[in-house]
């Protein structure tokens, strides 16, 4: 979650695959909360996974504090669980995936793709793979 843009991703109903959904312009907090409320109403997720910009040394810096403060506003208006995930390197991974798929150029925003990386990491960690013989 940045100061200007918020990438949004959504998982499939089985919580196996995360996909980029939309990029929200972050104007003021009230409008941004309203936009996220609309997405939650439309898609009815079980929870929100929010990327937390942890510093490379693992500490919570000023940007992470901003994210936590904004998430507090969200939790006041939504009846949805919020989980934080370390978002370090998510943009780099998203750019690599976009480049590998031929979709990477300077005019394409990668915020939603980075959100999908963060969500996919969460899904992979919480849903162990299963195999049908």
Curated annotation (Swiss-Prot):
SMART domains, A to Z: YqgFc (SM00732)
GO terms, biological process: rRNA 5'-end processing
A cellular component term, taken from the record's GO annotations: cytosol
Keywords: Cytoplasm, Hydrolase, Nuclease, Ribosome biogenesis
Principal localisation: cytoplasm
InterPro entries: RNaseH-like_sf, YqgF, YqgF/RNaseH-like_dom, YqgF/RNaseH-like_dom_sf
MF terms (GO), sorted A to Z: nuclease activity
Domain of life: Bacteria
UniProt keyword Nucleotide-binding, yes or no: no
Subcellular location: Cytoplasm
Enzyme class: hydrolase
Pfam families named in the record: RuvX
EC number: 3.1.-.-
Family indicated by similarity: Belongs to the YqgF nuclease family.
Task of the protein: Could be a nuclease involved in processing of the 5'-end of pre-16S rRNA.
NCBIfam families linked to this entry: RNAse_H_YqgF
Name of the featured protein: Putative pre-16S rRNA nuclease
Origin organism lineage: Bacteria, Bacillati, Chloroflexota, Dehalococcoidia, Dehalococcoidales
